[in-house]
Amino acid sequence: MAITENLIFTEPYFEAEMNHHTEGLEPVINTLRSDVSLKQEVQHMLVKFTSNTETLLHGDLHSGSVMCTDNETKIIDPEFGFYGPMGFDIGMLISNFLMAYFSQPGHRTENTLEQYQNWLLSII
């Protein structure tokens, strides 16, 4: 759980070894990192996250952890499992799809952009 705490509730809000971002995002990153009220709210969320053990979680659920065929779906890589708040895993998975959605203009041509973004939204 400590890795998850750091990656979600702590390290995004200051310069940390694991943080990497596109240079063009520097103004947005600086704004978020200097927002004291945002940091306070995140700390309230951290307290809720660490004190709520209502279900067993995967702990690192993202699109790379979901293996699908036409007939079945398997979830892999459970090594970060822990007890936590019920909505955490699905929230992480949805956020992974949303990050992919918003990053697509930097990765796709106009011809394929809208179709792929629509597909991502249809998954959610």
Spell out what each predicted region is.
Residues 1-58, 69:
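ATP-dependent phospho-/nucleotidyl transfer catalytic cores
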Residues 87-124:
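Active-site activation/catalytic loop segments of kinase-like enzymes and analogous catalytic loops
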Residues 73, 81-83:
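Activation segment
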Residues 66, 83-85:
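Conserved protein kinase catalytic core
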Residues 60, 65, 77:
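Conserved catalytic-loop position in the HRD/HxD motif
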Residues 50, 54, 86, 116:
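Aromatic-acidic/polar surface patches that form glycan- and anion
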Residues 1-11, 72, 87-91, 120-124:
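Internal hydrophobic scaffold segments of catalytic domains
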Residues 56, 74-77:
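Pre-DFG segment of protein kinase catalytic domains
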